[in-house]
Amino acid sequence: MADGTAANSSRRIFLIATEESGDRLGSSLMKVLRRRLDDAVRFEGVGGRSMAREGLVSLFPIEDLSIMGFAAVVKQLPMILRRIRETADAVIAAEPDMLVIIDSPDFTHRVARRVRARRPALPIVDYVSPSVWAWRPGRARAMRRYVDHVLALLPFEPEEYRRLAGPPCTYVGHPLIEQVGMLRPDAQERQRRDAPPPALLVLPGSRRSEIDHHMAVFGETLRTLQLDAGEMDVVLLTMPHLIEKVKAAVASWPLQPRIVVGEQGKQAAFRVARAALTKSGTVTLELALAGVPMVTAYRGGAVEAWIAQRVIRTSSVILANLVIGENVIPEFLQENCTPENLAPALREILTDSPLRRRQLKAFAKLDAIMATGQHSPSERAADIVLETMHASRGPE
């Protein structure tokens, strides 16, 4: 492991994160790197508010790249390509000792390839593996040309990289495991989980397109469920930039939810929730770690659905199912995302059913599956970043 000895001169590390989740990872990594290098480090790159609090001045607002959906990407393609060129040029001009790309592979990997072509000696670490195990597995082998090490958030990913002949890959741990204590209930909150009326979480997504696709079907699902299950305490979790859009959407719902915004409110809601209706994604792993049984749903545009049906190679698209290694969480995707399917499944997990018990039993395995030993994920990530940087020839 890397020691904490400061370099003789300040190290320069260029980081690129273009989504909020990557921004949080980058911020935690920056904190540890600064501590390990005794403050003899300068950060440059692209990031959001969390990385800005650690001193990063972003080349451009990451909101420029918060685009989802085939049609939206096509419309914004000239701007995206310009940002890729600008970012690669900025890396070259900065002459850093290390480049760390964080998630968002459609953007960051294009930057990395350009940088590797112009600065072949610059070490590049990829923090958050692309889903090579789910689709386009040939990417793993291709990454060997421009990535020196992959930092994996999921425990099964290193073996997938070995199988696919990709670059070295190390499981450093998912940041969610550092938040487990804030997600799980104390004794009083556990009593609330079991008390009537049941608290049902609704998580339609964090992007505008997801709100557009999910809110109507989720509202109708709750109407159907209420007819059968009776009174419920429905809590809808959303993001600050979506709150007005969400309020407009729920105005027509027969059952009005409490709308919660912010991390503390979300964690408090997780601790007392009996069950959840959620879109697919990382939030399924968060709910599983919190011990909240769930039903998952997802609707996308027609083009995205057509592509997904032809390229996804896994038996489930639910992250929690993949980490557990068992399809315990029901998933209703695209044309199957209907109130007729969702309401009965939710009714089942709200009661003490075999499905609910099976989910809870599977969720209890996650601590052992995702364990990282004595060090936090960001500490393990920093170790490999420093080892890779020290092993390189440095700037040309």
From Swiss-Prot:
Keyword field: Glycosyltransferase, Lipid A biosynthesis, Lipid biosynthesis, Lipid metabolism, Transferase
Pfam family, one: LpxB
Catalytic activity: a lipid X + a UDP-2-N,3-O-bis[(3R)-3-hydroxyacyl]-alpha-D-glucosamine = a lipid A disaccharide + UDP + H(+)
Molecular function terms from GO: lipid-A-disaccharide synthase activity; phospholipid binding
GO terms classed as biological process: lipid A biosynthetic process
Pathway, per record: Bacterial outer membrane biogenesis; LPS lipid A biosynthesis
EC class of the enzyme, as a word: transferase
InterPro entries, per the entry: Glyco_trans_19
GO cellular component: membrane
EC number in record: 2.4.1.182
Signal peptide extent: none
Job description of the protein: Condensation of UDP-2,3-diacylglucosamine and 2,3-diacylglucosamine-1-phosphate to form lipid A disaccharide, a precursor of lipid A, a phosphorylated glycolipid that anchors the lipopolysaccharide to the outer membrane of the cell.
Similarity remark: Belongs to the LpxB family.
The protein's name: Lipid-A-disaccharide synthase
Annotated gene: lpxB
